[in-house]
Amino acid sequence: KLRSKIEIKDLSSSHAVGVISKDKFEEIQEELGSKEKTVLYRESPCFVDTRLSSLGARILSSLEKLHLTIKKLNLKIIDKSNYLKLSHKEGIPIEGVMSLQNSLFGLESNFEELKAIDFKKGCYVGQENTARMKLKNKLRRRLLPVTSNKPLNISDEIKFNDQVVGKVLIGGQYPFALI
């Protein structure tokens, strides 16, 4: 419903979000006897990553119950770089995305592939431009993960046969470029 009154609370000081594998989420579903994509496990919402199932699921837990949730689910805490490497391989930028705000169209950011844009329903910011780009097949650039044998920084040019074909928009260990 448009213009519904909602309240958004910052729970970051009392809750944590964890990433779990798709297999672990399916175990939780089986334990609960549910096939829903969002389930409640011991008062903790757990939901599939709607962008790509290979990115697993999220579980939201209060900090008070976090240790117990980790223990009950037999989870292992792993280094964040494992998840960042997977998301980079899948073409999903995680870090550095705030610098992209207001600089790309949704289609350039792969929103259609990530199911963030549905051309059968409407009403979102930039709908007219996005629909026109889709209709006229005018998508010329796309945000893609890139790799290099040397470090890539924001604004570095991507060249092919000595011609500039793109520009790095997210630098660091897991860079993305608009190509």
Residue ranges: model-predicted function:
Residues 24, 65, 94, 139, ...:
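Residues that cap or initiate secondary-structure elements
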Residues 57, 85, 96, 120-122, ...:
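Conserved active-site beta-strand-loop modules that form the wall/rim of enzyme catalytic pockets
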Residues 80-81, 85-111:
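Short, conserved active-site entrance elements at the starts or edges of catalytic domains
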Residues 85-88, 121, 136-141:
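A short beta-strand-loop-alpha-helix capping motif that often carries His-Thr
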